[in-house]
Amino acid sequence: MWGALRSVLRPCSRASVPRQRAYHGDAVARLGTQPDSGSSTYQENYEQMKALVNQLHERAQYVRLGGSEKARARHTSRGKLLPRDRIDNLIDPGSPFLEFSQFAGYKLYGEEEVPAGGIITGIGRVSGVECMIVANDATVKGGTYYPVTVKKHVRAQEIALQNRLPCIYLVDSGGANLPRQADTFPDRDHFGRIFYNQAIMSSKNITQIAVVMGSCTAGGAYVPAMADENIIVQRQGTIFLAGPPLVKAATGEEVSAEDLGGADLHCRRSGVTDHYALDDHHALHLTRKVVRSLNYQKKLDVTVEPSEEPLFPADELYGIVGANLKRSFDVREVIARIVDGSRFNEFKALYGDTLVTGFARIFGYPVGIIGNNGVLFSESAKKGAHFVQLCCQRNIPLLFLQNITGFMVGKDYEAEGIAKDGAKMVAAVSCAKVPKITVIIGGSYGAGNYGMCGRAYSPRFLYMWPNARISVMGGEQAATVLATVARDQRAREGKQFSSAEEAALKEPIIKRFEEEGNPYYSSARLWDDGIIDPVDTRLVLGLSISAALNAPIQRTDFGIFRM
């Protein structure tokens, strides 16, 4: 049978092999053009973006230090590794660590600094397995949990649950920050949610590993107690529901922290802990052994091809995009600098051209890309919804490159059904079960944020460039709307609204929107998973897609699309 089939497929000896024709699609399969680096626009963009990137790296370096010099010295004098050194010693040598929410808590509590929110979270490869790592930083307020610390810890667990990543908790915390207990303890997504998430993930066979390297007090004691497997460091790690001061106050009993909840007690008597470590290095070595014992196998739902570098240097993104959001650029030039071989199989290239859609690969992984090239019209929205459906049908992860002012407005567009067409795209994005990743590379305004998979639409990961802006609308537009409302109100009262009054009304509104739309304002509140250097976008996306594919891709069911 197979021989007969091969003979059918073999070309006849007398037939001539048809000459390969060149088509328009072949010519545009590789994206990108060489920018005019000598132009004033390119140079201005480059300088502005480079300044923002330099600021990003300076601020990140400060955050990475953690607590004060005195706090760090006190920490290391006890024989402890600093939290970032713990992570470096835990992950596989030479492998990257994809850190999240580095600017959590940035300028959030006034004069009270909480670098990185007092906790470090991210994905690292441990014994060959991609793991979510959550490390308390005891140099920042004793590792106590501020409201933003809780939010960041819970977000890390959400990422782990969505992507089925084993969790490793490097515990060194004094528990909840008591002066802020009202914002850390009672609500659904407060401190208790951490332990709820541990239980749920363990029930779904997502391994939970705790390494007690310092204090583990009160409710925090449940982190190791609810772990699948745990490790404690001698004369350093302690676990108790009530510390020595509270025990004395409640019972009059005087006891040391070591006798109350140290490694000897929990490894030899209580059975709360499983492995006895001599120091931090030994504890991390044991952790790697635990991960090796998981018998973990990653099963991909996609085909992976050999990776290719883009044809264009990544730093050209600085000159192409820039910091001026009023200056337009072709999102294809961005795509050309992040995808394999700068290859892009564009979908519906001639229709709804303010939205660019198509297929590419990043580090060999398939991805469907949706990028903005202007305001969204009905055609753009319908095209976007169609493309999302294709990716869901084919199990292809989605990447959204946001630079959007919103959907088109006006009488004619309302009459043509922009509301229902925009709703199609929003519904498709909402229901899509393939991994979704969003990068805000410019503006993210209003309903455009919804259609392009903003935070509310559960992207697995959401990143911002340092030039990005996010708000319900631009500051000038908001100020104009509110000034119009004020003018109309005055008119109804038979009063005038002077130009000076209008300017006085607008100025603080514009200033407030500028402040609240800033990426650092967003990142401080965990509206995103981190601000990234545009040059690092390709690597960050590759790591994110790889992590997302640890979870099986679920079938997508769509609801009603209003036609």
From Swiss-Prot:
Pathway: Amino-acid degradation; L-leucine degradation; (S)-3-hydroxy-3-methylglutaryl-CoA from 3-isovaleryl-CoA: step 2/3. Gene3D superfamilies: 2-enoyl-CoA Hydratase, Chain A, domain 1. Residues 49-555 are annotated as: Carboxyltransferase. One of its GO terms (biological process) is L-leucine catabolic process. GO terms for molecular function: ATP binding; methylcrotonoyl-CoA carboxylase activity. One of its GO terms (cellular component) is mitochondrial matrix. InterPro entries: AcCoA_carboxyl_beta, ClpP/crotonase-like_dom_sf, COA_CT_C, COA_CT_N, MCCB/AccD1-like. Residues 1-22 form a transit peptide. It is found in: Mitochondrion matrix. Keywords: Acetylation, ATP-binding, Ligase, Mitochondrion, Nucleotide-binding, Transit peptide. It catalyses: 3-methylbut-2-enoyl-CoA + hydrogencarbonate + ATP = 3-methyl-(2E)-glutaconyl-CoA + ADP + phosphate + H(+). Carboxyltransferase subunit of the 3-methylcrotonyl-CoA carboxylase, an enzyme that catalyzes the conversion of 3-methylcrotonyl-CoA to 3-methylglutaconyl-CoA, a critical step for leucine and isovaleric acid catabolism. The modification N6-succinyllysine is found at residues 70, 141, 433, 495. Its EC number is 6.4.1.4. The modification N6-acetyllysine is found at residues 70, 495, 511. Residues 309-555 form the CoA carboxyltransferase C-terminal domain. Residues 49-306 form the CoA carboxyltransferase N-terminal domain. SUPFAM superfamilies: ClpP/crotonase. The keyword Electron transport does not apply. Probably a dodecamer composed of six biotin-containing alpha subunits (MCCC1) and six beta (MCCC2) subunits. Residues 343-372 are annotated as: Acyl-CoA binding. PANTHER family: ACETYL, PROPIONYL, PYRUVATE, AND GLUTACONYL CARBOXYLASE-RELATED, METHYLCROTONOYL-COA CARBOXYLASE BETA CHAIN, MITOCHONDRIAL. This is Methylcrotonoyl-CoA carboxylase beta chain, mitochondrial.
